[in-house]
Amino acid sequence: MGNTESNVTSGVKKQAGTSEQKLYKLVDIKGGGLLVDMMKRALQNKQYAEIDHAIKTKVEPFLYNKGKGRYIPVSHLVLLRNKERSRHKLLPPLRGMENPDEEFDVEIDWPQVTQEEYDANPLGYRELCWDLKERGAVGETILHLCILNASSLLANLAKRLLRFYPKMINDVYMSDEYYGESVLHITIVNEDPTMVKFLLDAGADYHERCYGNFMCPEDQKASRTDSFDHEWVNVQPDTNYNGYVYWGEYPLSFAACLGQEECYRLILARGADPDKQDTNGNTVLHMLVIYEKVGTFDMAYEVGASLNIRNVQNLTPLTLAAKLARTEMFFHIVNIEREIYWQIGATTCAAYPLDQVDTIDTETGLISKDSALNLVVFGEKDEHLDLLEGMLIDLLKTKWNTFVKFRFYRQFILFTCYFLVSLVCFTLRPGPPERGLNATTINSTMGPIVNETELASEGELEVPVNKMEGWWEDLTGECRLMNFDSWQAKVRIFAELLLWVGALMYVGAALREARFLGIKMFIENLSTVPSRVMFLISCLLMLVLPTLRLWCAEEEEDHLAVIIMLTTAPYFLFFCSLWKTINCLTITL
């Protein structure tokens, strides 16, 4: 995240030079133009013959099939949008062009698509009314310009245009910056419920998706790529959803994010689905969590939006609130989902569903990294601490008393025993031998035995049994750590065996935990407890000690033993965190 870049398309830059676009002579981006002047005179004189004639003669040449529209393959539209991207993101047909923005002709190899072909594959084609080559600088039509200026004069002109050419209503912006934005989107942004109703009555598509660069989260803009397989844009799934106008792509989501309840209800009444998901998998309720619209959230939920849909990051509205640390929204959704058993005054007895809250998946029994509790505990914002109240803290206390407390004390007792055994092992170790003595004996005993053993394994020499017995006698006699004559040595050897078995069991338990949690989550858990990391390292080193013992590498073993002791003892800090009086000191250390 944070992977953002500035991407101002050439069309946006060209809007300043409106004289190059024929469309702007009829209606320009400032609300002027030939048709605007005619419409003003028509409204004043109540004579519409002049404006009607101008629409028929001046607008119709800009349309496909005199306003009847034409089906365009989505693959051609994707190429038209893709030519505005940087060269390394261009699709293969455009990479060979020196200047794709000027050389690419969208009308080359256009097939004649019948109604039957469109009905068989509606996602493969888009019906357009306004000629692609006669559009504005950012792919807009005359209808977009009328609605964009948000005046009663231009609204009347827009209605007049739709009276003659009704199929213009579903034309969208074609440039990458605003791709997919329809007049319905613009009207919602203008907060004009009356015009929204008119457009819906005129047949506006209430499921049109607006996924232009301008409406994309900031940290996803650099990852935008195109594909011939579909019309929408591919983006990286990892995002923080921060965007100036990231409002969920659909008109219904636009209305919800902008708090336009009347527009929302109008669109919903026409059959719009509030559970439709945008490129990030977000529904209306996800978007309301992002923008913390509590009142609108209640309204959307009451009229049918679902709380159980997961987005691309596998987050429901509740878990999304937990991840983004939207404290008010989180507790609000929790209260919506709870089941109240009884209520007396300010006292309430309620049950909370745990399927999205608890770290244990209710279906698989595995750890859910996308649970609300896990997202809050591993959250990086200060606001995540505010979420550890009420239900979550009660859940943690219940889990502690039911499942963890006994195991924690048992682990503490077992580790204490392990540590005491390690003290016995390393306290009873004999001191170092006289300088030079051990090195001489090793060279005179181990070397020949090893060489003869290697030859024996190749079938060239048979080593007598008495020779091996002699090697063992030499090893036990010359290596101080293999001498079992005294009772202290026998106790030490027995304790070392116990310690080795204990280390093996600890390593095995860690491997089982990693298998259950998954490597990523296991490493995340270890990163929060450095003392446990040190202890596991000491266990691994303990498993290596027998090899050094058999080779009589006493100096190396002594060094390793010191490291083992130094990395074992700090594990007590983990268990000390149980007591509140020393917990702060433990965390500081």
Language model regions located:
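N-terminal alpha-helical scaffolding segments that mark the starts
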Residues: 2-84
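Ankyrin repeat domain, specifically the short helix-to-loop turn at the C-terminus of the second helix
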Residues: 121-129, 159-172, 197-214, 230-238, ...
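Ankyrin-repeat boundary/"N-cap" motif
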Residues: 132-145, 172-183, 209-223, 234-251, ...
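Alpha-helical protein-protein interaction/assembly modules
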Residues: 146, 300-303, 307-309, 313-316, ...
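Ankyrin-repeat intra-repeat helix-capping/turn positions
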Residues: 150-153, 191, 259, 292, ...
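Conserved ankyrin/ankyrin-like repeat signature
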Residues: 153, 157, 194-195, 262-263, ...
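Hydrophobic alpha-helical transmembrane segments corresponding to the first two to three helices
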Residues: 385, 391-587
